[in-house]
Regions:
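C-terminal membrane-associated helical module and adjoining short loops/tails
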Residues: 2-18, 157, 161-336
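Multi-pass membrane catalytic core of lipid/isoprenoid biosynthesis enzymes
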Residues: 77, 82-127, 173-185, 219-229, ...
């Protein structure tokens, strides 16, 4: 059994902020970009007030996320010590005293929730609910089969509603279904990849999630396919039914006199559907062929085809929703 050691030598205390930052998992902050989704699709991305308040909300949720990850590392200290990779984390490696880490995490959460209360009451409620959900997940829910992935999806849903509450935006049913389906797809895919790594490991019990032993491989495969399909179908319905944002005329409305009714402006988001379908298929390839997927945020940043499809999707969404805002007035008058 690995032994935990911590010393209070000067250099370790000097490096405390650095090790805390590593434990905070900045890469995981990518998940909090979900707060920007209502801002983008509401057509308010370039509204300075709403943009900066969403930025503030993003940093608050990133603080909460970091605090939760530090607490999680303290809870998982014993299992991390025998894990081939997790034992290198600062707390498990003895770089930070667990008590000090726990105190810092609690302080981070207190400051984050205090700042959340200054933005809006509903945002604060969402932040509190998210914090409670993540703590309960770390202590209990992640050990309950199926409930663990539903808790992960609920976290994304709370992020979206938190972002919507900041700008007083309406969130459509199909958009919510898209978020939930995609979150469940990523969570199930993560479990599928973790189980693949577990079965390929010579030591199948040390430092692993116990819940993985209760997930039949056939069940994970079925759920992966189910939520992969639900993700692109729900997004497709969202693009079919999404009305033009209230921020102003879309660039393609300018061509209304030259196009048949088949190409109404409210349907132009359909152009982005193929990129979403490709992204889903590429992620399935990563899970099954490359035997990866246990870290969705890492895959997004390292898999070039997937990253390219996401970037192209984002560019198209911005062009369709905000393109007319960047056309010179003379060109707009000419086209009209």
């Amino acid at each position: 059994m690995a032994q935990y050691e911590f010393t209070t030598k000067g250099p370790r205390l000097i490096w405390l902020p650095f090790w805390l930052l590593i434990s905070a998992r900045p890469r995981q902050w990518l998940k909090n970009l979900a707060l920007f989704a209502p801002l983008v699709f509401e057509g308010e991305f370039f509204n300075p007030n709403k943009f900066f308040i969403t930025i503030f909300g993003f940093f608050i949720f990133s603080m909460i996320t970091s605090g939760i990850y530090i607490i999680n590392d303290v809870i998982d200290l014993k299992s991390d010590l025998v894990h081939p990779y997790k034992r290198k984390r600062p707390i498990a490696a003895g770089k930070i005293n667990p008590i000090v880490a726990l105190i810092c995490a609690v302080l981070i959460l207190i400051v984050a929730l205090f700042l959340a209360s200054k933005l809006s009451s509903f945002f604060a409620y969402a932040a509190i609910a998210y914090t409670i959900l993540q703590i309960v997940y770390s202590l209990f829910l992640r050990s309950v089969i199926l409930v663990d992935v539903m808790a992960i999806a609920s976290g994304f849903l709370l992020r979206v509603y938190a972002g919507a509450s900041l700008i007083d935006a309406h969130v459509t049913v199909w958009f919510i279904l898209t978020v939930v389906s995609l979150a469940l797809f990523l969570a199930i895919g993560k479990r599928r990849s973790e189980r693949t790594l577990l079965m390929a490991s010579e030591e199948k019990t040390l430092g692993t999630r116990r819940i993985l032993h209760h997930y039949p491989e056939t069940l994970l495969d079925s759920l992966t396919i189910m939520f992969a399909t639900a993700s692109w179908l729900s997004y497709t319905m969202f693009t079919f039914l999404q009305p033009p944002p209230s921020a102003g005329p879309q660039v393609l409305v300018l061509f209304g006199d030259y196009l048949p009714r088949t190409f109404l402006a409210s349907k132009w988001l359909m152009i982005t559907v193929p990129f979403v379908i490709y992204g889903v298929m590429r992620y399935l390839y990563v899970i099954y062929e490359k035997k990866e997927g246990e870290s969705p945020e890492r895959i997004l940043l390292s898999d070039i085809p997937l990253l390219t499809s996401v970037i192209l999707w984002m560019v198209l969404v911005f062009v369709i929703i905000y393109g007319s805002d960047f056309l010179p007035a003379r060109i707009i008058r000419y086209l009209q």
